[in-house]
Amino acid sequence: MQRRHFLKNAAAALAALGLPTLPQWALAAKAVGLRRLGQPQPFDYAWLKGQARELANAPYKSHKQLLPGPLEALNWDQYQSIRYRQDHALWADGNGKFQAKFFHLGLYFHTPVHIYDIVDGKAQQLAYDPAAFDYGRSGLGGKQLPKDLGFAGFRLNTRKDTDRDFSAFLGASYFRAVGKEGQYGQSARGLAIDTGTGGPEEFPDFIAYYLEQPADDSDTVVVYGLLDSPSVAGAYRFAITNGDVLLMDIDSALYPRKAIERLGIGPCTSMYQVGENDNRMDWDWRPEIHDTDGLAMWTGGGEWIWRPLCNPPHLRFNMFVDENPRGFGLLQRDRNFDHYQDDGVFYEKRPCLWVEPKSGWGKGSVQLVEIPTVDETFDNIVAFWNPQAKPQPGQELLMGYRLYWGAQPPASSPLAHCVATRTGLGGIVGQKRSHFSWRFAVDFAGGELAALAKDPKAKVEAVLQVSRGTTEIVSARPLHELKGYRAMFDLVPPDEGTQQIDIRLYLRANGKPLTETWLYQWTPPPPSERRIY
């Protein structure tokens, strides 16, 4: 599948969107009018893993289907007008804190998803019912649709706010969530396969979801997912706890059908078009356009790393080798509306997504893929964990991790952190330039920097390394407006070539690091385009 087409469609669609006197099964069906198929069957996670193992032992069969003509013909506005009726919401009749609603098939979503309700340890499939949907401007109101059509996915909301969902699962293995800001942004996926290899990328599908009815006083919704693709089948358990920072506690069991070249665990998918450090696509009236502005990593060795994102001229792939990482994620650190000026999509409210392994993941690497884009509806940034050992057929790969969605990740360094990266033409103001150089200004705040900025005797220095070229005009000076420091340097690229240059920077005093490590990758322009004005 063409990644650009798939991700543009998926991103846009996800952005839209007393004591009973009867047995609970009967009460739920009667109260919300949900039709059910078959009889309730015993269910647990071990059974679901068995189902995934059976899938992996059989040849893969595509789950996509040809939709009825009226659904195939829907345009974007028509599909967006279809809404699930509140009076048919799952668990709407009870006293619990949560409800679930379902997405209709159509437009880009051709893979039917079977959805089950779990009550008292037994699962029963929920039937598609045209009466459960308000078809709005879609033109489907009077059309007959198959009773076994199925759903495209689901969304969760609280009983106190039935109009705004806090999590949604829709399209392939994509899902999203929000923190207290209530603004969707980047997405997560169940699995990434062969992302950024240069060949076709594989997008596994969740083909079934099992939603466990929460206890009335529970703050957590438990969802199970069955995943399938040509390369792998898998079983997932999501424990979703809503809050200011939404937590997803995830267990997954993967069963490869064949060897996988590049397996991505805990994949985060985001968008970066233009920002302070990268204005290659700066024709828009808004100064910055991005869901996230950097990749943060807390390595197994305890180092904190910040890698600002870019919209590169060509596909860019980076791997950060590690062992037993403590966490990583795509973050939106810049929370200033004035830096975005978009009062429609509110980029300053987009959630960070932090991935925290629950146990040792062994050797591997955090991998970052950056893809050129001219369109903010295309998710062009992907970050994930890639195990060093390539999965083989017949193996069981068990991975447990937590996802945190919100304005701030749960873990933070005691050291100062990077708050801004800016770049531009180098040289000394007022003096004629004799050669081309590129200026980097990196701002740090937090930690001990506020106190050091007030101390005239403080000796703070920038520790700088580059893989190619030379550096000049290197400095580190207090930036009182931030109660921090600004590191500045000019990078002079080699005379020939446009090979990428890796940069590493941090601040220290008396031999002790004061900041997280700032990493960057810069592609110098061709010599013919190196204007010095």
UniProtKB/Swiss-Prot annotation:
It comes from Xanthomonas axonopodis pv. citri (strain 306). Keywords: Periplasm, Signal. PROSITE patterns: TAT. Belongs to the OpgD/OpgG family. Pathway: Glycan metabolism; osmoregulated periplasmic glucan (OPG) biosynthesis. This is Glucans biosynthesis protein D. The gene is opgD. It is found in: Periplasm. GO terms for biological process: beta-glucan biosynthetic process. The keyword Signal applies. One of its GO terms (cellular component) is outer membrane-bounded periplasmic space. Pfam families: MdoG. Predicted to be exported by the Tat system. The position of the signal peptide cleavage has not been experimentally proven.
